[in-house]
Amino acid sequence: MAKLERKDRKFKFETLQLHVGQEQPDPVTDARAVPIYQTSSYVFRNSQHAADRFGLKDAGNIYGRLTNPTEDVFEKRIAALEGGTAALAVASGAAAITYTIENLAQQGDHIVSAKNIYGGSFNLLEHTLPNYGITTTFVDIFNLEEVENAIQENTKAVYIETLGNPNSDVVDIEAIANIAHKHKIPLVVDNTFATPYLVRPIEYGADVVVHSATKFIGGHGTTIGGVIIEGGKFDWEASGKFPSLTDPNPSYHGISFTKACGPAAFVTKIRAILLRDTGATISPISSFIFLQGLETLSLRVERHVENALKVVEYLNNHPQVERVHHPSVDPDPKQQELYKKYFPNGGGSIFTFEIKGDSKKAQEFIDNLELFSLLANVADVKSLVIHPATTTHSQCTEEELLDQGIKPNTIRLSIGTENIDDIIQDLDEAFKAIQ
């Protein structure tokens, strides 16, 4: 009973989100729920066993900073849901993005990134990484010629988000992947806003997928975490641009990660070196909470999307709204085409609209909402609101804000799973209060 042993059977997403990584009850206790292994370290059977673990000859646990059995289940499950070969959970989404870039680029290297990304990611690429000799060219990701022209000899990756932040623009993952692969570099995709339930970027050519697990994966605004998923198809050796992955690594017994770890080389190197040395480790309890979140991911996302599309329709017809930025109502035919291709079941419960008026009017509207929580998070089951220009993207210059589609009167909504009538009533009363 309760054993997923048939290798000839391919399970669907809703089943995988419940079972992968714990195909049978805990072998020691028979517990059906994944146990929380709250431990810092692990006992080795003997000296040779310890040496084999440290030499990566035995894949078991070494130390809590690197691995944990609860974390392992979470990693296997999210890898399966994204269609990847391996995953690494870390302490935050920011850590996941930082480790991914640092695993690809070193001093003197270059990244090509979309302009329309999360403000924290923009600051990392624009201000922090240049201190370590890694530069970034930001491009209009919808102009494929501009993307390709930005790639240099020292470019190590193209970085995008499935849905741009904060306006939920749909990016053509497949087209960008083709450009990246033409130049023998990987495509990195932040899939936080879409989730693998709506879009699996690896199926469209992405090589590495990152998430802020804090958002839809956790789903309840309780826990900080991030995850990196490896697609397993990029040929690091044929590329010739990533010696730290392909050549003997002096920091780890002269190991070649591609030869030793195959399709898990990318995340294994992060775990063995970057995580070992800098320690942005996820806690066992956080991993457990994210597993709880994954078990209801499809159910929650369905409701998020259902509610969001009704709110988009309401706002799109409201006299006090200048424009709604959501792919379902985007006037650009190309966005409509991409939305149908990548989101056949709908999507985008995090989006923006421009209220008629200025920054003060936008903030006045926000302050009159009661059901919506004003906070710096998204993808909670509770509906959320924020004024990007003065909060999440406040470090950007006016020019950078406009480049990212953010105006003084832009308001970002994250639509929750409350009753849709209550959500719309709250918006309606806030509009009436500022007339």
Language-model segments: residues:
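Short hydrophobic/aromatic beta-strand micro-patches
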Residues: 229, 352-354, 414-416
